[in-house]
Amino acid sequence: MSQQLQSLIEQAWEDRANLSPKAAPNDVRAAVANVIDQLDQGALRVAEKKDGQWIVNQWVKKAVLLSFRLEDNAPMTAGGFTHFYDKVPSKFASYTADDFARGGFRVVPPAVARRGSFIGKNAVLMPSYVNIGAYVDEGTMVDTWATVGSCAQIGKNVHLSGGVGIGGVLEPLQANPVIIEDNCFIGARSEVVEGVIVEENSVISMGVYLGQSTKIYDRETGEVHYGRVPAGSVVVPGNLPSKDGTYSLYCAVIVKKVDAQTRAKTSLNELLRGD
């Protein structure tokens, strides 16, 4: 089934210039709707870790993009306090108390998650934003004013602190999603974009900005990483001098590996999770 679905999406992608809300074959509409539905349930992901490597399902990302070609804007309401006009409905638009109980997560007003995003059990959405295609795994806290961009992959027991920005893939168009692996702590107002991978058990300090061109300097080894924070790293903002010493440029610095002291400062509060 998934192979047939993928084939339909790939064909529709090649013909995307000819697609619109008023001009699209029924099988294409059904295929795109199927993908969005599976993303919403967590049955399908834009990226998966297999044999220790992250594999991006580009065709799934294409289905997300195609959904914008196929849908018209429509009025939407939010709890009676305001109105919206958009192509993608809220994930929770038709949720009942039973649906929330089955989901096993908390959603604090006025948090927004778009349909096609997945929220795992014991996750907590403070007033935040989760975009279409994103995957937020079990036990993760998305704190106030944090943003989880389109198709971003957030692991288990992650803490995204207040105002954190996790970049998406839709605009500007990115090849790969941002991935935050299990048990990571992302400090307040930090930004992770352009498909950067933060590997498991890492701690990112406040105000760290990570993109593909950001130098990630390991002060113990002198090694410079791009696009990847090694597992168990503690990262803070810093600067590196130019070759001629006339100026310095921003970088991120790996100051040490996570230890017991770091964990004590960044541990999750189980009282905030669960039923």
UniProtKB/Swiss-Prot annotation:
One MF term in the entry's GO annotations: nucleotidyltransferase activity
EC number(s) on file: 2.3.1.117
Keyword Cell division set for record: no
InterPro entries listed in its UniProt record: DapD_Trfase_Hexpep_rpt_fam, Hexapep, Hexapep_transf_CS, THP_succinylTrfase_dom1, THP_succinylTrfase_N_sf, Trimer_LpxA-like_sf
Official protein name in the record: 2,3,4,5-tetrahydropyridine-2,6-dicarboxylate N-succinyltransferase
Cellular-component GO terms for this entry: cytoplasm
Keyword terms: Acyltransferase, Amino-acid biosynthesis, Cytoplasm, Diaminopimelate biosynthesis, Lysine biosynthesis, Repeat, Transferase
Broad EC category: transferase
Residue sites binding substrate per the record: 106, 143
UniProt pathway annotation: Amino-acid biosynthesis; L-lysine biosynthesis via DAP pathway; LL-2,6-diaminopimelate from (S)-tetrahydrodipicolinate (succinylase route): step 1/3
PANTHER family documented for this protein: 2,3,4,5-TETRAHYDROPYRIDINE-2,6-DICARBOXYLATE N-SUCCINYLTRANSFERASE, MOLYBDENUM COFACTOR GUANYLYLTRANSFERASE
One biological process term in Gene Ontology: diaminopimelate biosynthetic process
Record note on quaternary structure: Homotrimer.
Family, similarity comment: Belongs to the transferase hexapeptide repeat family.
Protein location: Cytoplasm
Catalysed reaction, written as an equation: (S)-2,3,4,5-tetrahydrodipicolinate + succinyl-CoA + H2O = (S)-2-succinylamino-6-oxoheptanedioate + CoA
Keyword check for Cell membrane: no
